[in-house]
Curated annotation (Swiss-Prot):
It comes from Ovis aries (Sheep). A lipid is attached at C257, C264 (S-palmitoyl cysteine). Residues 1-24 form the signal peptide. InterPro entries: Leu-rich_rpt (IPR001611), Leu-rich_rpt_typical-subtyp (IPR003591), LRR_12 (IPR041283), LRR_dom_sf (IPR032675), TIR_dom (IPR000157), Toll_tir_struct_dom_sf (IPR035897). This is Toll-like receptor 9. Gene3D superfamilies: Ribonuclease Inhibitor, Toll/interleukin-1 receptor homology (TIR) domain. The gene is TLR9. One of its GO terms (cellular component) is lysosome.
Length: 1029
């Protein structure tokens, strides 16, 4: 970013007036510099604002219901900041003034909130003050429903902080005292501080260094979050009156530090201590979190009376041995989710795991998480108690170092929908290996990898092309050590519908026999492997296969001289989605793909340019895909796209992606060969202009993306004939303007026009500004992301931040023209007159010059700005006080019409000028220079510089302008003062000690300042300075 030049104040005034007038007329976006979003939300995030913006009176401020000011630099909130937003309900002020520990540069910051800031908004329901350096709870309106004070500097909550907040239901105050926001103490919640909040249902006090449960909490609470404090004992009285509690989180209070991902305090020996009756009275409890609590065993009494418990989190404890023999699960018949992850023994990986029989009593269990327990073998005895659970749908076993797995055991689970065995060491049905897969958190629902996910242009109908696995039986074996696949692995898994095998090392040639048992398989992910596609009957054993991901299997395609057979595609009758992306396919593949069912093909990341360069060999490569709707040809190194290439694409195409190629030219008229095309993506290419013709008439194109090219010119009327175009992306190009003639009547139907990140030329009166204002409902990010590229001082700024100094003023232009014409005439006349009558002019000039000094001198005397320039040492407070309260008052205020004009540094010096410029102007613009001295033995700084300038004036103008005022007799001992008193007594004045002599002093000082010093010199010694006549 270049240096910023501050505009002239007058320019800012004119600019502000012009913007205010424009806003009053309703032309500019109503909430500049912020952005108005649907449902009355105003977004002011990341604008580096230093104060709350004051929106124009012409803006529909009454319609604003939500204001977001996240990540600005607002350090002071005033009483009047939100008064004009009469219907504001949601206010977000996160990350404006973060505490030192949370600041990126660790700078301390404290936010100031005036008393009536929020009281002035009686409709406010949700307020977020998180990540701000506030030390106390501000005054809040009674309408507040949700309040967030997390990651602030509030360390004390007292009874008066929430007075009158009877409607408050949600209170968040997390992270006010922890390792990232240190405070060296515990947050203090006074007993009964929250008791007055009769409707409070959700209270979160995580990461606050608490050592006990706050006393006398509101009985209305149904959610209490106290995790990651230091509460190591729990007794019934801690939760005595919380009978309505539904969710309780007390995890992380006595941590297991060998698995901690952040600074951790070791749990004391024999802790935590939980009283047997701690939870017995919480009959409505549905969720209990005891994770990361250093538990070695579970007491049956802890769960007595918890008949409604549905979610139990016991992860990150030491319960490995206990889960093989516990009996506590027999009575938890309503439990739906159980988390036992990372209950491993330190530095131990067990050969087998056998769950306790009591797991069979979890008849309502739907999800069981057991990743990170570290056992090497998964057999039919491992999960036997779970096989009869009628509702179990999800089972997570990832990251367990399993190298032997009998996958057939999952066929015995009647309702199982998802099994996650990713990040293990499975290499086959019964052959262990020693390698360890990468650690991954796992996923609950299978999703396509990022490389396969359809982009924005495919989002409309993506559901038609990519079947979802959310409600189907899914097995995830990704990130294991599989090298080959045998059909024995999938015995009894005929119900399986989704299989994920990505990120393995499968390098075998699939021949149609590997997946024989999986007769119902619909989705197969084999990405990031090394598959050899040599056989023509690959995957033909899967008659119901709808989606096949073969992306990132590039190694076989990079082998020189090895052929690849893609004819299997024609033999998959149900295949709808196929990905061959990022395989580097360039030669020795089937000459043509054929399929009557395929609707979406991802062929990105290959080398189609090399294939089409081989004459007509691969010209019809895609033509056999008769019902193809979506085709992705991104990153195929295409430099040209000839009409015959488009002509041999399927006529059924609706979406075509050509992103990130090297296309510098596109024949727009050739779009007629794709009559069904609705979306075309040409982003990230090298197009310089949209100039060769226009979009053809009759095209069904609805979306066109040409962003991230180098387009600097568009032919007028280019988009006119595409009357169905709804979305147009021209962002990140080289456009200097946006011309309404490009679109014609299309502007009436265009829903999205993205022109952000273009170097627009913000000249005054630019036509594109008016056009974009007319289209502002269709232009995303108009007020923030549509910026200027020129002139230089506006680069990167909003198009509405124009500097009006750049505007063309016709009157000023005529004046400048007249002045330049006069200068030209003078430039011609002066040499001519010098040539014709130079001697006469020279004589007249010098004759006039002889009279100028006296007149100039007299004129200068009359036009001096000040009678005296007062110089004194500001560091001496007594002297400064005398000058301001005695000298100034006597000479300027009490002399009536004879008042003198004094020049004082603090008052009369011009800001912006250098010290020497102000000093020189003060000495030469004053009749006298008066030095007010308290001592004369050490004179330096401003006094010395002023004295030297006065002496310089004596030498240049032969004027003695020095007047000395001595406040103490001790200063009278100076040799210079004594000499000057003998030569020019009236210019040296002593402040009298007796009040009776002060009247005479002021009279003598007035005479010394109004008369020339020449009249004061002692004629016995000298005549004083004289001026040449």
């Amino acid at each position: 970013m270049g240096p910023y030049c501050a505009p002239h104040p007058l320019s800012l005034l004119v600019q502000a007036a012009a913007l205010a007038a424009a806003l009053a007329q309703g032309t500019l976006p109503a909430f500049l510099p912020c952005e108005l979003q649907p449902r009355g939300k105003v977004n002011c995030n990341w604008l580096f604002l230093k104060s709350v913006p004051r929106f124009s009176a012409g803006a529909p401020r009454a319609n604003v219901t939500s204001l977001s000011l996240i990540s600005n630099r607002i350090h002071h909130l005033h009483d009047s900041d939100f008064v004009h937003l009469s219907n504001l309900r949601v206010l977000n002020l996160k990350w404006n003034c973060p505490p030192a520990g949370l600041s990126p540069m660790h700078f301390p910051c404290r936010m100031t909130i005036e008393p009536n800031t929020f009281l002035a908004v009686p409709t406010l329901e949700e307020l977020n003050l998180s990540y701000n350096g506030i030390t106390t709870v501000p005054a809040l309106p009674s309408s507040l429903v949700s309040l967030s004070l997390s990651r602030t500097s509030i360390l004390v909550l007292g009874p008066t902080h929430f007075t009158g907040l009877h409607a408050l239901r949600f209170l968040y105050m997390d992270g006010n005292c922890y390792y990232k926001n240190p405070c060296q103490q515990a947050v203090e919640v006074a007993p009964g501080a929250l008791l007055g909040l009769g409707n409070l249902t959700h209270l979160s006090l995580k990461y606050n260094n608490l050592t006990e449960v706050p006393r006398r909490l509101p009985p209305s609470l149904d959610t209490l979050l106290l995790s990651y404090n230091h509460i190591i004992t729990l007794a019934p009285e801690d939760l005595a009156n919380l009978t309505a509690l539904r969710v309780l989180d007390v995890g992380g209070n006595c941590r297991r530090c060998d698995h901690a991902r952040n600074p951790c305090r070791e749990c004391p020996k024999n802790f935590p201590k939980l009283h047997p009756d701690t939870f017995s009275h919480l009959s409505r409890l549905e969720g209990l979190v005891l994770k990361d609590s250093s538990l070695y065993k579970l007491e049956k009494d802890w769960f007595r009376g918890l008949g409604r418990l549905q979610v139990l989190d016991l992860s990150e404890n030491f319960l490995y041995d206990y889960i093989t023999k516990t009996t506590i699960f027999r009575n938890l018949t309503q439990l739906r989710r159980l988390n036992l992850s990372f209950n491993y023994h330190k530095k131990v990986s067990f050969a087998h795991l056998q769950l306790a029989p009591s797991f069979g009593g979890l008849v309502s269990l739907e999800k069981l998480d057991m990743h990170g327990i570290f056992f090497r073998s998964l057999t039919n005895t491992t999960l036997r108690p779970l096989t009869q659970l009628p509702k179990l749908q999800s089972l997570s076993l990832q990251l367990n170092f399993i190298n032997q797995a009998e996958l057939s055991i999952f066929g015995a689970f009647p309702s199982l929908l998802f099994v996650d065995l990713s990040d293990n060491r499975i290499s086959g049905a019964a052959r262990p290996v020693a390698a360890l897969g990468e650690v991954d958190s796992g996923v609950e629902v299978w999703r396509w990898p990022r490389g396969l996910a359809p982009g924005p242009l495919a989002a409309v109908s993506a559901k038609d092309f990519m079947p979802s696995c959310n409600l189907n039986f899914t097995l995830d074996l990704s990130r294991n050590n599989l090298v080959t696949i045998q059909q024995e692995m999938f015995t009894r898994l005929s119900r399986l519908q989704c299989l994920r095998l990505s990120h393995n090392s499968i390098s075998q040639a699939v021949n149609g026999s590997q997946f024989v048992p999986l007769t119902r398989l619909r989705v197969l992910d084999l990405s990031y492997n090394k598959l050899d596609l040599y056989h023509g009957r690959s995957f033909t054993e899967l008659p119901q296969l709808e989606a096949l991901d073969l992306s990132y299997n590039s190694q076989p395609f990079s082998m020189q001289g090895v052929g690849h057979n893609l004819s299997f595609v024609a033999q998959l009758p149900s295949l709808r989605y196929l990905s061959l992306a990022h395989n580097g396919i360039h030669s020795r593949v089937s000459q043509k793909l054929s399929s009557a069912s395929l609707r979406a093909l991802d062929f990105s990341g290959n080398s189609l340019s090399q294939m089409w360069a081989e004459g007509d060999l691969y010209l019809c490569f895609f033509k056999g895909l008769r019902n193809l709707v979506q085709l992705d040809l991104s990153k195929n190194h295409l430099h040209t796209l000839l009409p015959r290439h488009l002509d041999n694409l399927p006529k059924s195409l609706r979406q075509l992606r050509l992103r990130d190629n090297n296309l510098a030219f596109f024949n727009w008229s050739s779009l007629t060969v794709l009559p069904q095309l609705e979306a075309l993506d040409l982003a990230g290419n090298q197009l310089k202009a949209l100039s060769n013709g226009s979009l053809p008439p009759g095209t069904r194109l609805q979306k066109l993306d040409v962003s991230s090219n180098s387009i600097g010119f568009v032919t007028p009327g280019f988009f006119v004939l595409a009357n169905r175009l709804k979305e147009l992306n021209l962002s990140a190009n080289a456009l200097k303007t946006v011309d309404p003639f490009w679109f014609g009547r299309l502007t009436e139907t265009l829903k999205i026009l993205d022109v952000s990140a273009n170097p627009l030329h913000c000249a005054c009166g630019a036509a594109f500004v008016d056009f974009l204002l007319e289209m502002q409902a269709a232009v995303p990010g108009l007020s923030r992301r549509v910026t200027c590229g020129s002139p230089g001082q506006l680069q990167g700024r909003s198009i509405f931040a124009q500097d009006l100094r750049l505007c063309l003023d016709e009157t000023l232009s005529l004046d400048c023209f007249g002045f330049s014409l006069l200068m030209v005439a003078l430039g011609l006349a002066v040499p001519m007159l010098h040539h014709l009558c130079g001697w006469d002019l020279w004589y007249c000039f010098h004759l006039c010059l002889a009279h100028l000094p006296r007149r100039r001198r007299q004129r200068g005397e009359d036009t001096l700005l000040y009678d005296a320039f007062v110089v004194f040492d500001k560091a001496q407070s007594a002297v400064a006080d005398w000058v301001y309260n005695e000298l100034r008052v006597q000479l300027e205020e009490r002399r009536g019409r004879r008042a003198l004009r004094l020049c004082l540094e603090e008052r009369d010096w011009l800001p912006g000028k250098t010290l020497f410029e102000n000093l020189w102007a003060s000495v030469y613009s004053s009749r006298k220079t008066m030095f007010v001295l308290d001592h004369t033995d050490r004179v330096s700084g401003l006094l010395r510089a002023s004295f030297l300038l006065a002496q310089q004036r004596l030498l240049e103008d032969r004027k003695d302008v020095v007047v000395l005022v001595i406040l103490r007799p001790a200063a009278y001992r100076s040799r210079y003062v004594r000499l000057r008193q003998r030569l020019c007594r009236q210019s040296v004045l002593l402040w009298p000690h007796q009040p009776s002599g002060q009247g005479s002093f002021w009279a003598n000082l007035g005479m010394a300042l109004t008369r020339d010093n020449r009249h004061f010199y002692n004629r016995n010694f000298c005549r004083g300075p004289t001026t040449a006549e």
